[in-house]
Amino acid sequence: MKKLSLLLIMFVLSLCSMAQGCNKKCDSDSCCDVVRVACIGNSITEGFGLAFPSSQSWPAVLQQMLGEGFEVKNCGVSARTLLNSGDLPYTKEKQWRDAKSFLPNIVIIKLGTNDSKPWNWKHKEDFVRDYQLMIDTLKALSSHPSIYLCTPIHSENVEWGIRDSVITNEIAPLVRLLVRRNKQKLIDLNILFPNDKNLLLDDGVHPNVDGSKRLAEIIYNEIKRKEL
């Protein structure tokens, strides 16, 4: 009897170790400890310009909103592009490797702002292909994450080459197309995040503290509506 009980315990433990694909909040009866959320993005995700990005960036605020049972990882890198042919491709960075090795249950992708720069957007014919490659790579993870694609927020900075007309009229529609094509989840920040300069730093690109909170609220509400 003792031998049988031991075998049953070992079997249950082995099942728990294999259950990496859960994307619901875990309770005390679950095999999961936490729901892992990876936030992939550029400087807006990293928290550029904020006094305390570790607590004020939108991933940090999202962690506070989700609370216990969730682990949010900020994988943002300033100035990076979705385009692999851009000047600073995100997929060349350590944070991309970290996001994959994190084996997230939920992935939030917020890229595209830096792709709007003329020297990057000249490769626009590669945008859908490169984004699809990122989606396919994430879908192949053993954790089988839910993937949220975000359209970029309104941003404009002539000196940096960031063009809101390209973001709104070209990049955002392509992100929506990819959502439909892959049957993934959309967070349409280009529409949901107010086009209000009071929510941005003086550079016209990066959210201030209030903007970061608003961004986190929108993303939290979408996760809550679709996952919890």
Segments (PLM) and residue ranges:
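Active-site beta-alpha turn of Rossmann-fold NAD(P)-dependent dehydrogenases/reductases
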Residues: 41, 76, 151, 190
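Extended, non-globular alpha-helical segments
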Residues: 132-138
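Conserved SGNH/GDSL esterase-like catalytic core that processes O-acyl groups on lipids
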Residues: 33-38, 44-132, 166-169
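Active-site segments of SGNH/GDSL-like serine hydrolases
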Residues: 110-114, 138-169
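N-terminal secretory targeting modules
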Residues: 1-40, 44-53, 60-69, 100-105, ...
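Conserved beta-strand segments of alpha/beta enzyme cores
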Residues: 71-73, 146, 183-185
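Catalytic His-Asp segment of secreted/periplasmic serine-dependent ester chemistry enzymes
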Residues: 11, 50, 152-228
